[in-house]
Amino acid sequence: MSLLSKLHLILYICLLLLPLRFVNAEQLSGSGESQPVHIEADRIDGHYQQEIEATGNVRMRRGDQTLSADHVKYYQDTEDVEVKGNALLERPDDTLWGTFLQMNLQTDIGELRDPRYALKGGNGRGSGSLLLLEGENQYRIKKARYTTCPEDNHDWYILADDLEIDNEKKVGTARHASIRFKDVPILYLPWMNFSFSKERKTGFLSPIMGNTSRSGVEVSVPFYWNIAPNYDATITPRLMSRRGVMLDNEFRYIGQGLGGRLQFDYLPNDLVTDTTRYGLQFNHSQFLGSGWFGALNYNRVSDHNYFRDLGNNILFTSQVNLLQQATASYFSELGRNGMLTFSTLMQQFQTVQDPRAPIISPFKILPRFTLNAVKSNVYGLDFDLASSFTHFSHPTLPHGLRFTAFPSVALPLENSFGFIRPRVGLHYTKYDLNTPAFPGTNDKHPDRSVPIFSLDSGVVLERDMTLGGGNFIQTLEPRVFYTYIPYREQRLLPNFDSAEMDFSFAQLFMEKRFSGEDRINDANEITLAMSSRLIHSATGNERLRFSVGQRIRFSDRRVLLTSPQVTRAGSDFIAELSGSLAQHVKTDAGIQLNQNNLLIEKIRTGISYNPAPGQVINAGYRFTRDVLEQVDLSTQWPFLKRWQGFAAINYSLKNDKLLAGLLGLEYNACCWSLRLVASRFTTATQKTSTNIFVQLELNDLMRIGTNPIRVLQQSIPGYVRTDLQ
């Protein structure tokens, strides 16, 4: 070996043995297959593949982790790191601070003293006395504090002896936890877990507390069971001071082409009534393949007072007939421009009775088969067939079988500015009854054939106009609709499902005046109507619509249900207005005027002012001569700072009675909300129920109390949660 080569070798060995000093950056590799470590600092000392000591503005990167501190000691052979002074560990799922850190970079095991932490992907943060790193995405905090409030805000927090954070499952688990609001303990839980993401997880949900006039103080503790990605269950023990312990159970499922929900609430022994009480709701729908679809909707309660005593949902408590129904349907194309549908239906109702005013329950349908076919543009004609076969059953009224068929053909003549559509059909009905429908007749097999003719026509005229600085299209749409149906005697036919339809602008253009199939009205009448729409030229949105119309009769009406014979030459006068009267102001109004005496028969008015989310005022008035007169008022409106007020009233002027009322307040802080709502409503059995909702919502953690959101949504059209904005 030459002298020069020997000198090079000696110099290389000396460089390896010399400590590293005054180096700004160094890339190092630990043992095995570990990721490279990059260190930046004011000063770095150490030996290659042994111990590295960095001081001053230290920044150490390994993979997706970054460690910052005043002083770092790194052992390359074991990948242990020791950090002193202002330790900051940044990772994809969280950021950790502390005064002293010991950890292994490969196993993520170690400890952090005097820790503070912030969870990414959410607002969770906190502190503790000691943080134990227990592997990738896992750590445990001793004497922990947790909150979702921002820095320097301690309105609410959890104090726990032990808090586990699982960043992989996005779940926190606290032991011996005290929830504090404004530094006051409000709830102690020996064990609790919570999610700091929107993903579903198994565990106890926040307790629900409230008070009702019928059940007293209520406390519920829901348990959510995430059984599988496509089905879950919520089991809720509900303790009522006056009635005992009720178990509310909800099961939901969804699959390919199917889905459903089962709600079963069970009170084994009501302390007030000394009876077993329950409520059941089951909904299921499913595509069966090859054009078939099935659905089931079953509702039942144990007794007539169930909703009044145990319900807190306005929609349910106002129900009289609880639907119990199963359907199966088939859909298929019928060649080109055609559709064939077949369906079967089983239907009955549980009638919730008011002992002071009992009603007759509806007929059972056991079963009904329907077959409908539509074929369009056959040599310019549209063919239609509607048919049904139904078995009606009732414990006290005459019942039996009914067959109906209504074939029709229409000739649609249309172009860009108007249309003419004549149609002719024959409605046939046949009965097979267990007993004659009325005393004095022996016919148990009556039938009826009624031809029906109609002619619908209309024109659409347009013009451009400028209004309020905007460009609009105004339409003028006159429409004429003529119907001829000869009179057929029907007083001796049963009436299973026919009722007179509400008179409205849309009903002016219908051939039939009755729903169902048992009554076919006679008609020789013409409808004259005019509509005008205001359409925004750029967007195509309809800004305003005004419609007016009247049906003129050329002969007296003879087919009636309960009303006296109508001999007037014309129907009542109908006018409707809907759309935006001004910015943020919407209206929907209608009036029905008696043409003979110019008396108002019906009024429907509604106006809404909604300048921004969380700001809405609604007002409505409804009037039907000799039937009802009601006023509806509701609002959601902010006042002061962070406060909102709620109010709603449905009042009967005819009976001088409050039908439903609501009053509430909400305070929205940056990380919590407090809601107080009182509601009172009349049930289907004409009895009143009063509920008080108090709820404290700790953002991204839990809700304590009874949730009034559903009641607010039902009572105030346009209500939105401003804490989610």
Swiss-Prot record:
Keyword terms of this UniProt record: Cell outer membrane, Membrane, Signal
Instruction: Give a yes or no for keyword Aminoacyl-tRNA synthetase in this entry.
Output: no
Recorded GO CC terms: cell outer membrane; transporter complex
Domain of life the protein comes from:
Bacteria
> A Pfam family this protein belongs to?
LptD_N
**Main localization (coarse):** membrane
Which Cys pairs are S-S linked? none
For the keyword Transport, the answer is no
Q: Which InterPro entries match?
A: LipoPS_assembly_LptD, LptD, LptD_C, OstA-like_N
What are its GO biological-process terms?
Gram-negative-bacterium-type cell outer membrane assembly; lipopolysaccharide transport
The signal peptide here is 1-25
Locations listed in the record: Cell outer membrane
Protein family per UniProt: Belongs to the LptD family.
**PANTHER family given in the database record:** LPS-ASSEMBLY PROTEIN, LPS-ASSEMBLY PROTEIN LPTD
The entry describes its oligomerization and partners as: Component of the lipopolysaccharide transport and assembly complex. Interacts with LptE and LptA.
Function per UniProt? Together with LptE, is involved in the assembly of lipopolysaccharide (LPS) at the surface of the outer membrane.
Q: What is this protein called?
A: LPS-assembly protein LptD
Species of the source: Nitrosomonas eutropha (strain DSM 101675 / C91 / Nm57)
